[in-house]
């Protein structure tokens, strides 16, 4: 009966097409049962604070020893702040404002983009795993495939279309540079990862976390790793992102002008665990202001792609044999779409 009730609640929420923002605008003072996190999730939110020496690494793209530092961060943390990346602050600010502007619109302006078809060029939704998860998360999402074939401007939301296209081009250039540095950190030719098409595809995720009346009972986005080679995240100043490191949840406190880079599952697989995919989450927003973030994942996401990937042969040896079987990104996406967000994916490909 309980699962049936949850299913009907999820169906009603989905069919309303108003998202979490619509719930907040309706004046609710308690979160619906659909969004109440599991006891295990709530217990993890009360875990002890990390030791002070555990701080998120920062990589200066124009600094000395950048290859060594980016390699160390990718190996030990799977996530780092990136400064001096070359993208103007004005562009970053317009990107955040654009995504926030979309989500802050009246429901009718957003409904034409609402969909559960994750192969669409552009879609607005709340919780991709709404029907599979034990509890929904307190966020709404605008998703868009931005490479290799960017959408037409007229197909994008008017409030943010131009900056979406401009920003995605900036991130493509930055991503290519990051893949060069990561290739060198692996001891490979600087073009190795790019030649593997790691930078070929992009998917933009514009997340909106409205203020929550009961932030201690739900979560912004549950713990997960990204199904990507690399994710470039732009966050506003509200905060809430946390990364799991050495058995602690550590705040990824916003740094003005910086981007957050995290290694995805695909990169962990092809580097044979040399680089690690960072498990992260976002706690529910208890402030009076909405939290907005923009992630660009270097991935085909839910679109079919037949290229086969496996551990890079140049990284393997008798002492370091392949830990994963070959697979396509489509196989990975199929598992992702059939599971809850927090379900591990990499172990399905372990040898």
Swiss-Prot record:
Gene Ontology biological process: biosynthetic process
Entry binding sites for Fe cation: 224, 226, 280
Cofactor: Fe(2+)
Keyword annotations from UniProtKB, A to Z: Iron, Metal-binding, Oxidoreductase
Fe2OG dioxygenase domain sequence ranges: 200-304
Molecular function via GO: 1-aminocyclopropane-1-carboxylate oxidase activity; dioxygenase activity; metal ion binding
InterPro entries attached to this UniProt entry: DIOX_N, IPNS-like_FE2OG_OXY, IPNS-like_sf, Oxoglu/Fe-dep_dioxygenase_dom
Enzyme class: oxidoreductase
Pfam families the record matches: 2OG-FeII_Oxy, DIOX_N
Assigned EC number: 1.14.-.-
Highest rank taxon of the organism: Eukaryota
UniProt KW Acyltransferase keyword: no
Family: Belongs to the iron/ascorbate-dependent oxidoreductase family.
Protein name stated in the entry: 1-aminocyclopropane-1-carboxylate oxidase homolog 4
Taxonomy of the source species: Eukaryota, Viridiplantae, Streptophyta, Embryophyta, Tracheophyta
